Amino acid sequence: MNVLPCSINTLKGLYEISGVEVGQHFYWQIGGFQVHAQVLITSWVVMAILLGSATIVVRNPQTIPTDGQNFFEYVLEFIRDLSKTQIGEEYGPWVPFIGTMFLFIFVSNWSGALLPWKIIQLPHGELAAPTNDINTTVALALPTSVAYFYAGLTKKGLGYFGKYIQPTPILLPINILEDFTKPLSLSFRLFGNILADELVVVVLVSLVPSVVPIPVMFLGLFTSGIQALIFATLAAAYIGESMEGHH
């Protein structure tokens, strides 16, 4: 009977799953501050990829665009169209902000699946996509919230706060709560999806041969791109809403 060996193999697989490191962090002590080193390292890598690729492509623009130029122009047009659709005709000043958010999240999400972070050994925890950490997603959501209020105050002045009593003052607490829950929904949605995707891949790799999780990894790449698009779209929509009025 092969029941006993199968049971032993199953228990070994479950033991490996239980060893997946979630919530274990490696810190640097800089002055009087404790810094989350894992997020800083991976974020620096992502920023280096973005800045390096952009510098290489745009430092010597050609009259006849190269493939790299065409790609970056397509990305820029995509971000412009997204901003214009959600914000309206006054989208211009917000293109850099929306574009920065989209590109950083997109490359961060993909880095979790494409870059071999695990070959870098740390005393505690392990490297993963920057967006796999709640600190990163909150840090991305808070500037979005600030931009939301800034856009409304710039466009309408103090009259912007009149939206909180529309259509009736009874809704004042709900309208205030709505604005302060937007950054929470942005941060937790992104964090939850990226963390869940990486955990699913780790679990499947622990239980089944390495070939089987490949379709799941491709699905993860697709959903990672979708999450970046959702974040950028909602950020632009919130800014557009604050400039146009409460819906």
UniProtKB/Swiss-Prot annotation:
Mind telling me which InterPro entries this protein's record contains? ATP_syn_F0_a_bact/chloroplast, ATP_synth_F0_asu, ATP_synth_F0_asu_AS, F0_ATP_A_sf
Any one GO MF annotation of this record = proton-transporting ATP synthase activity, rotational mechanism
Q: Any stretches that span the bilayer, and where are they?
A: 38-58, 95-115, 134-154, 199-219, 220-240
How is the protein disposed in the membrane? Multi-pass membrane protein
> Record's GO cellular component, any one?
proton-transporting ATP synthase complex
Q: Where in the cell is it found?
A: Plastid, Chloroplast thylakoid membrane
Keyword annotations from UniProtKB, A to Z: ATP synthesis, CF(0), Chloroplast, Hydrogen ion transport, Ion transport, Membrane, Plastid, Thylakoid, Transmembrane, Transmembrane helix, Transport
Say yes or no: keyword Transmembrane helix present. yes
Query: Does the keyword Transmembrane helix belong to this entry?
Result: yes
**Family the entry assigns:** Belongs to the ATPase A chain family.
What does the UniProt function comment say about this protein? Key component of the proton channel; it plays a direct role in the translocation of protons across the membrane.
- Record text on subunit structure and interactions: F-type ATPases have 2 components, CF(1) - the catalytic core - and CF(0) - the membrane proton channel. CF(1) has five subunits: alpha(3), beta(3), gamma(1), delta(1), epsilon(1). CF(0) has four main subunits: a, b, b' and c.
Which HAMAP family has this protein been placed in?
ATP_synth_a_bact
Q: What name goes with this protein?
A: ATP synthase subunit a, chloroplastic
Q: Which organism is it from?
A: Nandina domestica
Q: What is the lineage of its organism?
A: Eukaryota, Viridiplantae, Streptophyta, Embryophyta, Tracheophyta
